[in-house]
């Protein structure tokens, strides 16, 4: 069986969804920029040799509709002979795109794939056009369709306090800001043009979403947004709304070596799992356990972990039940997470995987885990193994 490997991985800066730097850029622009960027950075790869493009996106309508993957590929100037498909597993879409490419390589269907994902939440809101079947009320709780209420329920079940959530959100912003100031994001961000508040053209090199002025005291004053009467989840402890894309060049190990390309990491194991939709944020626990078992390693073998921070109220129970609470500051979301950077739905799976691989290199560790929850009760996880000299 062929080994799927990561040759390169990049992302755009994360822009604020409300009047942010990408307000005049479309989802296809963000995606095409990264597709072109990966090929420019790896000239040994003949664009015509790409077997397929898998691109995650959740709200596949308006500018993100009609197979945004193909639209972006055409915009990027990729040969017309190269196919492209848009993948949707809600929040896990671009990680699913990675899994699809990895399996294609493992089965010998191809050697070279571009994968990634995008979401322009400023142009296509998360709830745009949503229309749940009324019959779902007979099999799941009515509130299961509200991600914020599922986070509230998870916090209640696991005894997660408002104070713990505020502390975790503060940590996310502080770590993301430190990573920005110290240049730790520079290797994973591919700068691109955007627009300042006055409409002038600028080069966007850093994430716009991080709020370095965040304090625990300030967070403590915010009102609960999903359950105003007795809730604990606030806008400040939820993932920020942002616009962004991420991308990876995935190849068979044999093809990468043949072309003399660097092998950044091997895909060691992949898993998805379901859980009660009422606690959708718990999905990373069964998915991660499944992936670790497939990899033949334990949670203690992991050097770094990237957990998508949908909500602090969701992240804390996951870390608790995965046995990570005692090593959070040594292993988990070391450069902050989605509370600070945002969670552009279709982008996040390959975004956290990209951040993870760069951290694995920085920390010189062998194994890393990227995992995330998925709306309506799913989780997805990938174990990466760094190729060490």
Swiss-Prot record:
The active site is at 91 (acyl-thioester intermediate), 343 (proton acceptor), 373 (proton acceptor). It is found in: Cytoplasm. One of its GO terms (molecular function) is acetyl-CoA C-acyltransferase activity. The keyword Lipid metabolism applies. PANTHER family: 3-KETOACYL-COA THIOLASE FADA (PTHR43853:SF11), 3-KETOACYL-COA THIOLASE, PEROXISOMAL (PTHR43853). This is 3-ketoacyl-CoA thiolase. One of its GO terms (cellular component) is cytoplasm. SUPFAM superfamilies: Thiolase-like (SSF53901). InterPro entries: FadA, Thiolase, Thiolase-like, Thiolase-like_sf_Thiolase, Thiolase_acyl_enz_int_AS, Thiolase_AS, Thiolase_C, Thiolase_CS. Disulfide bonds: none annotated. Keywords: Acyltransferase, Cytoplasm, Fatty acid metabolism, Lipid degradation, Lipid metabolism, Transferase. It is an enzyme of class 2 (transferase). Its main location: cytoplasm. Catalyzes the final step of fatty acid oxidation in which acetyl-CoA is released and the CoA ester of a fatty acid two carbons shorter is formed. Its EC number is 2.3.1.16. HAMAP family: FadA. The keyword Electron transport does not apply. GO terms for biological process: fatty acid beta-oxidation; phenylacetate catabolic process. Pathway: Lipid metabolism; fatty acid beta-oxidation. Belongs to the thiolase-like superfamily. Thiolase family. It comes from Pseudoalteromonas translucida (strain TAC 125). Heterotetramer of two alpha chains (FadB) and two beta chains (FadA). It catalyses: an acyl-CoA + acetyl-CoA = a 3-oxoacyl-CoA + CoA.
